[in-house]
């Protein structure tokens, strides 16, 4: 009788998880504003569910609080200066890693592998689900044969966001001391080395960066600028989300063609079709009600798999710093962004609050001011 009762309880919990995940995916569908075919998203959900038991990030013995605050009230949640005591909580870090592994495995999900696709294969875009792309010969040639993170493990990892809070931080030297450095969206480093460092082991490149930072490669000058940036990576992993939306197809192909034509020394990676929904599912089941995870949150979630200690820099989604000084959205350009806009696909202040909670518990270290030794 006791065994039968346990079976019924397990079945009920399983149905609850399925219901919650499908509700979350329906929410994504409404945000994107598309209608029609659901095959691709449903298959991503099924894949996610196959790895997920409902797990919670433990903060002070309980799960992360559900947070809906999108105002600049989050500025009140200040971070202590770099010189303040911070101690790594290894027990919590390991627990988070195990929980995330129930949703995704960064070693596998960081990239689709060559053996899983062939030229001409049809892929449904993650967000434009009624649109498809064919795997091109160039894309196929650049798919890795094995995971670029296979059997990799690092003592310390730095994830460098792009907030203007990095300016005058003097964090460059500290960032470069870490075992593995992750950067976002091909952000420039040479001219900002004192504040952001130079070392790069993995850098992401959303297709929109080609439009915004390299003028859609409209002429030879812009193509040369992109080539210089790519050559500067010098063997790093270039992580290109090629399967997100239809609008990025041409830009991904342009970059792939340049890499092959000029024999650029990079290791390309193209994230799995299930990764984004798996990451979102993990945070949602921990009561962090994000919309679409930012690149920074994606990178943190992946890094828990292969990094013992994780240090975040340049994560600050507010227009003012802790001293009420203006902060640029990006340290390297004049782009404006509505952090609390309902139209934004991201919920950056909410993500920050979750990361700050983890910082306070020692699961990661979040630096938002000057680094030790900065002058």
UniProtKB/Swiss-Prot annotation:
Q: Which ranges make up the Lumenal topological domains here?
A: 24-375
Is the keyword Protein biosynthesis assigned to this protein?
A: no
Q: Which residues lie on this side of the membrane: Cytoplasmic?
A: 1-6
What does the record give as the active site?
A: 346
Give the UniProt tissue specificity note. Expressed only in newborn brain.
Modification after translation is described as: Autopolysialylated. Autopolysialylation is not a prerequisite for the polysialylation acitity, but enhances the polysialylation acitity.
Q: Which residues are glycosylated?
A: 60, 72, 89, 134, 219, 234
- Keyword check for Cytoplasm, yes or no: no
Keywords (A to Z) from UniProt: Cell membrane, Disulfide bond, Glycoprotein, Glycosyltransferase, Golgi apparatus, Membrane, Nucleotide-binding, Secreted, Signal-anchor, Transferase, Transmembrane, Transmembrane helix
The record's comment on protein family reads: Belongs to the glycosyltransferase 29 family.
Q: Spell out the protein name for this chain.
A: Alpha-2,8-sialyltransferase 8B
Tell me the organism: Rattus norvegicus (Rat)
């Amino acid at each position: 009788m006791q065994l039968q009762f346990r079976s019924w309880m397990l079945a009920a919990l399983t149905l609850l998880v399925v219901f919650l995940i499908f509700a979350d995916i329906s929410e994504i569908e409404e945000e994107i504003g598309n209608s029609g075919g659901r095959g691709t998203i449903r298959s991503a959900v099924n894949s996610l569910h196959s790895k997920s038991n409902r797990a919670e990030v433990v903060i002070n013995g309980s799960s992360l609080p559900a947070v809906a605050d999108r105002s600049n009230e989050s500025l009140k949640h200040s971070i202590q200066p770099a010189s303040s005591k911070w101690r790594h909580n290894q027990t919590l870090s390991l627990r988070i890693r195990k929980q995330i592994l129930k949703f995704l495995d960064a070693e596998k999900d960081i990239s689709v592998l060559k053996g899983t696709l062939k030229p001409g294969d049809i892929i449904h875009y993650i967000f434009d689900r009624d649109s498809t792309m064919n795997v091109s010969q160039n894309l196929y040639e650049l798919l890795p044969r094995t995971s670029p993170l296979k059997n990799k493990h690092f003592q310390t990892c730095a994830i460098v966001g792009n907030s203007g809070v990095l300016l005058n931080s003097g964090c460059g030297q500290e960032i470069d001391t870490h075992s593995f450095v992750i950067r976002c969206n091909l952000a420039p480093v040479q001219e900002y080395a004192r504040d952001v460092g130079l070392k790069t082991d993995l850098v992401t490149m959303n297709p929109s960066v080609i439009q915004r930072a390299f003028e859609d490669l409209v002429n030879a000058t812009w193509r040369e600028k992109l080539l210089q940036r790519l050559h500067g990576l010098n063997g790093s992993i270039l992580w290109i989300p090629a399967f997100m939306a239809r609008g990025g197809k041409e830009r991904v192909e342009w970059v792939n063609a340049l890499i092959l034509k000029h024999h650029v020394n990079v290791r390309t990676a193209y994230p799995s079709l299930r990764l984004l929904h798996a990451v979102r599912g993990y945070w949602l089941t921990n009561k962090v009600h994000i919309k679409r995870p930012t690149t920074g949150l994606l990178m943190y979630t992946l890094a828990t798999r292969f990094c013992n200690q994780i240090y975040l820099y340049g994560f600050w989604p507010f227009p003012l710093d802790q001293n009420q000084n203006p902060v640029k959205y990006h340290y390297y350009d004049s782009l404006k962004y509505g952090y609390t806009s309902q139209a934004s696909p991201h919920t950056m202040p909410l993500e920050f609050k979750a990361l700050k909670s983890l910082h306070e518990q020692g699961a990661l270290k979040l630096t938002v001011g000057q680094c030790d030794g900065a002058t």
